C-alpha cells in the first residue's frame, strides 16, 4: 500500500520497479503483463517496456503510448476496474504518511496533481515526465453526471512545467 501511494503521489519510479518485481518476478515479465492488459482494455498503440514509464528501447521498439490509449487506461482505472474505488481514493489524496517497519521514521508523500484543486469535480490524475516525452498528464473530472478525461503528451519541457495545467483546464472547459 505504501509503495502504491509513493508511486502514484510522488512518482517514485523505484516503487513501480519493486511492485513489478514482486508481482511478476521481473520487470520484463511485468511489462509483458501490462502490454497484454492494455490490449485487453482496448489500447491499440501502446507498448510498455518499463513499469514506471521511463524512456526505454527494446530491439527496434520504444516504450510508447498515445493520448487516446492513455485516456482509455484512465477510463478503465476510474470506471471499469474492480479496484476503481481504491484507485480514486489513492489518486485523490492530497498527502499520505507512512513509517518504516520499526515505526521510528515517518515518510510523507504529497500529491503533485494540481488539477485536483483547479476545477470543481476533478477526481483523479497522474503526472509524468521523461526527456523524450516531456511533461505528460492524464486527468479526470465528473460534472453533471458525466466523466471527462484529458490526456496530454509532450506538453512542455523544463521551464514549461505548468503548461499541462492550463491546457488541461482549457480542454476540460471546452468539453463541458
What is each PLM-predicted segment?
Residues 10-13, 144:
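Short flexible coil/turn linkers enriched for glycine and charged/polar residues
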Residues 8-10, 17, 70:
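Short, functionally critical alpha-helical segments immediately adjacent to catalytic or ligand/cofactor-binding
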Residues 6, 22, 36-37, 90-94:
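Short acidic/histidine-centered micro-motifs embedded in hydrophobic/aromatic stretches
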Residues 20-80:
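Mid-domain, small-residue-enriched loop/turn segments at the edges of structured enzyme/sensor domains
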Residues 1, 9-11, 30, 44, ...:
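Extracytoplasmic/periplasmic mature domains of Sec-exported, cell-envelope-associated bacterial proteins
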Residues 43-44, 61-176:
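Domain-terminus/edge residues, biased toward the C-terminal soluble/receptor-binding domains
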Residues 2-6, 16-26, 54-63, 127, ...:
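Second-shell loop/turn segments in exported
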Residues 17, 35, 121:
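Short glycine-/small-residue-rich flexible loop motifs, especially phosphate/cofactor-binding loops
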